[in-house]
Amino acid sequence: MSNSLGKLFQITSFGESHGDCVGVVIDGVPAGLAINVDEIQIEVDKRKSGAKAHTTPRREDDRIEIFSGIFNNFTTGAPICLVIWNKNIDSSEYERTRSKIRPGHADFTGFMKYGGFNDYRGGGRFSGRITAGHVMAGAIARKLISTIGIEVIGYTAELGGITAKLPKHKDIRQNISQSDVNCPDLAASKQMVALIQQAAEEGDSLGGVVECIGLNLPVGLGEPVFDTLEGELAKAIFAIPAVKGVEFGAGFGASRLRGSKNNDPFNIQSDQIRTTSNNCGGILGGISDGMPLHVRVAVKPTPSISLSQPTVNLDTMTNTSLEIRGRHDTCIVPRAVSVVEAMTCIVLADLALRAGIIPRVIKQ
Amino acid sequence: MSNSLGKLFQITSFGESHGDCVGVVIDGVPAGLAINVDEIQIEVDKRKSGAKAHTTPRREDDRIEIFSGIFNNFTTGAPICLVIWNKNIDSSEYERTRSKIRPGHADFTGFMKYGGFNDYRGGGRFSGRITAGHVMAGAIARKLISTIGIEVIGYTAELGGITAKLPKHKDIRQNISQSDVNCPDLAASKQMVALIQQAAEEGDSLGGVVECIGLNLPVGLGEPVFDTLEGELAKAIFAIPAVKGVEFGAGFGASRLRGSKNNDPFNIQSDQIRTTSNNCGGILGGISDGMPLHVRVAVKPTPSISLSQPTVNLDTMTNTSLEIRGRHDTCIVPRAVSVVEAMTCIVLADLALRAGIIPRVIKQ
Amino acid sequence: MSNSLGKLFQITSFGESHGDCVGVVIDGVPAGLAINVDEIQIEVDKRKSGAKAHTTPRREDDRIEIFSGIFNNFTTGAPICLVIWNKNIDSSEYERTRSKIRPGHADFTGFMKYGGFNDYRGGGRFSGRITAGHVMAGAIARKLISTIGIEVIGYTAELGGITAKLPKHKDIRQNISQSDVNCPDLAASKQMVALIQQAAEEGDSLGGVVECIGLNLPVGLGEPVFDTLEGELAKAIFAIPAVKGVEFGAGFGASRLRGSKNNDPFNIQSDQIRTTSNNCGGILGGISDGMPLHVRVAVKPTPSISLSQPTVNLDTMTNTSLEIRGRHDTCIVPRAVSVVEAMTCIVLADLALRAGIIPRVIKQ
Amino acid sequence: MSNSLGKLFQITSFGESHGDCVGVVIDGVPAGLAINVDEIQIEVDKRKSGAKAHTTPRREDDRIEIFSGIFNNFTTGAPICLVIWNKNIDSSEYERTRSKIRPGHADFTGFMKYGGFNDYRGGGRFSGRITAGHVMAGAIARKLISTIGIEVIGYTAELGGITAKLPKHKDIRQNISQSDVNCPDLAASKQMVALIQQAAEEGDSLGGVVECIGLNLPVGLGEPVFDTLEGELAKAIFAIPAVKGVEFGAGFGASRLRGSKNNDPFNIQSDQIRTTSNNCGGILGGISDGMPLHVRVAVKPTPSISLSQPTVNLDTMTNTSLEIRGRHDTCIVPRAVSVVEAMTCIVLADLALRAGIIPRVIKQ
């Protein structure tokens, strides 16, 4: 296992789905950053199931607790430990089906890698619930990068094959609260909701694409040749369970363009060098170029479905089938939005510190 | 800058396009691995321009030199330094157009990040030539993971929009040497070659998609939650200039499937647990599951084109236009194949060491 | 701040002296290690003030809590979070003298480095209490290295200038529980206790030397050229507040010997290569040589004394004097023994994993 | 093996004593630092044997070569690779005695750890010659920290038991060039030279103590709780072969002082907070306090002596004896001075970058 991420803004994740808690330690946060517990709670609530229709109906009362690193509402320079307690855990279903490895989940690989000692309840360490820790860390990162003006906003760009129209930045901010699936194209949003309803009734699940945008990035974030802005973001985002693809700007589409179309011409805008298009997604040579950062993330359909699936019984080493009971998100894409945002904030915070753009003490 | 990659199998890259050399130090290679200089040379030759038609016609006589870490044809446990000298460098064109930042290149971001001190000749540290170092390191990694049976093969899956038929593993090995563009679908290969010819005549360039496959991986490679197999591979592959997207298995396509179609059912094959499909690309929960690893890589069209492009003159801060002279690859996708293979080998070597699957001393 | 230590066995420390808690996350512990909460509690109790005479009389009721990473009494491969709550904290004295920087403490450097945002209560992050976290992590490390037979024992070798006779290993284990100062030379122990009594009455404090011994180390721990066994141990041990010197084997004494006396001759003992003396402290070329590891640690006298000291008032920037009230250890050397042991166990665990000597799954 | 050191100013060492070369890659050097090859050469020459009497008489013609990272005499932000070629190597003596492990050397531990594959010629990777790479990196670090006014000076404080009088800083700079053993106390220097002569005639060797001083350090270098200034320096210095002890300020002597004597009182000097004594060696809480840094390093006597020593024959696994022929330094302490200085510069450069005190681009 390797549960730390980042070089100067470094997060260390701990906890399990059905253990005592999910938590994170954030090291390297500059001293003097004003932090209010509610600012972190808001981000965690965004991710929370039950916040909106059509995700897990069980109610998670996720109150965050600050254990260290914040004193008189300012960061101290010391590591910040944040925890959410797990409550009302019922592991009986996992005990019942324990020997049957769930397709699309980490039951098999986890069992093999950890010699059967891994906590299998609720997926244990592989559960999407672990990302609550990422989101807490992301809230601190978001606050930190806001001191240099960076804003990070994400949305559901595609769900079950339904594609949202490309939104303007202000539409994302305005419309997203009106959508049950975090999609600013409200017409598409309605279709997505209907499709989730239908898939849920069929006992099946859906995937989609999250797009995340970073605004007001300075030129210079990214540490080539290995710690590129793309590479660091991709690594962080692949830590979100169910992510199977990451692309920047025109991405896979760029591979079908000619150079004359794909190259973003430079020109001078308000005395600054900008590009007139943004196929590169705000990144050239692995370094932010001052244009908006664009990253798109492919999320596979939720592997937990109630339809019967062929699988193997680990105890008897025989073929069998499995029906997963209980309530699971039909589509996690809307919830993944806040996690993709969090990972983006975390990486930008780390790279801004590494580039020397954010100082070691924040002076308000 | 950050020029080291990997935790136990760690490579450190150095050199510039028009400097003295391109080199790499590889630390953490177990002692006792038999290494012949020719094995490394073969990989470098694969990447070399001029090896096949339609890539850069200039001839690079890239003889690798071993500076350290290998004694009596075996690794010693000490760091291995490998170097290729740069020869017959002509930087006059770069001097001529120095103040005009090339669209699609790192000229602008490099200038800004390094305060104008960066070596701009031939793209300096951002040049594709730097990947010759990655390929040397990849050759060592390839030899190391072959001791546990892993094989890594890549090919051109798509070029300028032309898609190769999905090949069988043996076809990749057999056909690729007959293709000028590293495409085992020889019919598609012919079309790709013709398209390159045409784009070259038009002064334009093409992109494409590289697919890379890992065979015979043990179950257990990948260190979640942050150092997942996907995340580590993606980060390494984004260190290749021009890569704008990475996906695993069904990738972005998976986001449009239902769970019942995307989940790979388990069954028992020859007393081993395998899946009957491989939409997950051989990775579950960030850990290899024993099925073939599948990664697909989007490569943007070469940014160096001879068509005129709008850009900015850094010295005068005025809008201008640029025509890039000299000979450049119309499409780097065929050459990128060996680099994607190299990065894959490097990551697998690191993760196999981290999983304790490769010992610290190799005993033949 | 940098609060993580280790490469494969990695600990991340958090918490403050007068905050909610002191805690540690331990990542990289192999799955399958049997862990009982009492085993960790025993180590924490050893460090605890009040356990023996002449250290801080205040009673710390330090019950450890396991938050993650242990399931059914075995490690799971997931990160282990351990916490001790801070109770009955009275920060009034620190509030009273806040502006007067305490000589010998980190008040001044902490204030300067963190822009005055650091938690000054009880020394905050610089307090010796933070080492309770190190000791919890050390307990896990101790259990892990015991699986390959390694034993780590420490003792007070010198206190206030009184030197203990060099003990036999079995005497350390037997006598130490009879000494109030963790000194196996019981005659010297009595003198040390008397000296502490005297210094306490005078409002002054004492320092000393801790010796720590590692038994049954395999040959091969240490990763030169930079991560030597000496270097890794020294770095870890200097994380203990008040440590000002570290030496191995004959140490500074070796610098006054001739080579013919200092070199440890090899010979064959029970079919194994051993040295007939151990001036090198069990380390050659930065790597364990199979002989007992010997490290000696200089601990400065407790900086908190009740005698009046000249200092500066930060608010007024004027010279002033300070008398520190409250109860403080007259000598922390006896308590430092368990912390030095803990750091030694942590480093040996990390290096044993790095050398591939401890597997990724422990099979009992 | 682990051959990289540092987090932001990161050096990677390679090469062997009797291989092609000794080299180093330095990553993370800010762009815009003026570097002249002669500045590096001067430092390497200081370390060079033959530069002064009584060290190895063989003449090393160590001309450094810059392979990358410097363009038009300024650093570019790219990794800097520096190399010294090994010339006139005669390995015959090592071939002759190969099976006899040399007491006090790493022959035994190296053989065991690397399964016999290690390059044994001249000690291979464990040779003191490797420190030539450290010194090259140290020259770059020295130049970098000079941009914020830091000066690092070292000297022979003790040799074979002869102790130099504590020098004033200006005496170190002035007198050291007049001493054949880098000792500014010229009377002691004469005695040391005579003692070396005598030990050489007896076929024996001597050790000693190097003191290194850092002047004009800003307050704030050091990243507790684990990456303390003491810990980072100690780790780096223990990478020098033959070092067996490291202490700061009063060091082991502090352990025998009372708190009232050891605490350094604060007062205001020229509007700045300073201490009136410096028992802490310029470090409080693991962070520089603005006073001179004092570190003392115990160097064991050279293990290579011409007197006969009992040892073991690895091939036959029998007891035997060994006489080491050839010319070896009777005492390496004078040469170690420049290496201790180099390691100190390297650590200070890294910590100054980590503290945000040195910017990412140097503007002259």
UniProtKB/Swiss-Prot annotation, chains A, B, C, D:
<keyword id="KW-0521">NADP</keyword>
<comment type="similarity">
    <text>Belongs to the chorismate synthase family.</text>
</comment>
<dbReference type="GO" id="GO:0009423">
    <property type="term" value="P:chorismate biosynthetic process"/>
</dbReference>
<dbReference type="InterPro" id="IPR035904">
    <property type="entry name" value="Chorismate_synth_AroC_sf"/>
</dbReference>
<keyword id="KW-0028">Amino-acid biosynthesis</keyword>
<dbReference type="GO" id="GO:0009073">
    <property type="term" value="P:aromatic amino acid family biosynthetic process"/>
</dbReference>
<dbReference type="Pfam" id="PF01264">
    <property type="entry name" value="Chorismate_synt"/>
</dbReference>
<comment type="subunit">
    <text>Homotetramer.</text>
</comment>
<protein>
    <recommendedName>
        <fullName>Chorismate synthase</fullName>
        <ecNumber>4.2.3.5</ecNumber>
    </recommendedName>
</protein>
<dbReference type="GO" id="GO:0010181">
    <property type="term" value="F:FMN binding"/>
</dbReference>
<dbReference type="GO" id="GO:0008652">
    <property type="term" value="P:amino acid biosynthetic process"/>
</dbReference>
<keyword id="KW-0057">Aromatic amino acid biosynthesis</keyword>
<dbReference type="InterPro" id="IPR020541">
    <property type="entry name" value="Chorismate_synthase_CS"/>
</dbReference>
<feature type="binding site">
    <location>
        <begin position="300"/>
        <end position="304"/>
    </location>
    <ligand>
        <name>FMN</name>
    </ligand>
</feature>
<keyword id="KW-0285">Flavoprotein</keyword>
<feature type="binding site">
    <location>
        <position position="285"/>
    </location>
    <ligand>
        <name>FMN</name>
    </ligand>
</feature>
<keyword id="KW-0456">Lyase</keyword>
<keyword id="KW-0288">FMN</keyword>
<keyword id="KW-0274">FAD</keyword>
<dbReference type="GO" id="GO:0005829">
    <property type="term" value="C:cytosol"/>
</dbReference>
<comment type="pathway">
    <text>Metabolic intermediate biosynthesis; chorismate biosynthesis; chorismate from D-erythrose 4-phosphate and phosphoenolpyruvate: step 7/7.</text>
</comment>
<feature type="binding site">
    <location>
        <position position="327"/>
    </location>
    <ligand>
        <name>FMN</name>
    </ligand>
</feature>
<dbReference type="InterPro" id="IPR000453">
    <property type="entry name" value="Chorismate_synth"/>
</dbReference>
<dbReference type="GO" id="GO:0004107">
    <property type="term" value="F:chorismate synthase activity"/>
</dbReference>
<feature type="binding site">
    <location>
        <position position="47"/>
    </location>
    <ligand>
        <name>NADP(+)</name>
    </ligand>
</feature>
<feature type="binding site">
    <location>
        <begin position="125"/>
        <end position="127"/>
    </location>
    <ligand>
        <name>FMN</name>
    </ligand>
</feature>
<comment type="function">
    <text>This reaction introduces a second double bond into the aromatic ring system.</text>
</comment>
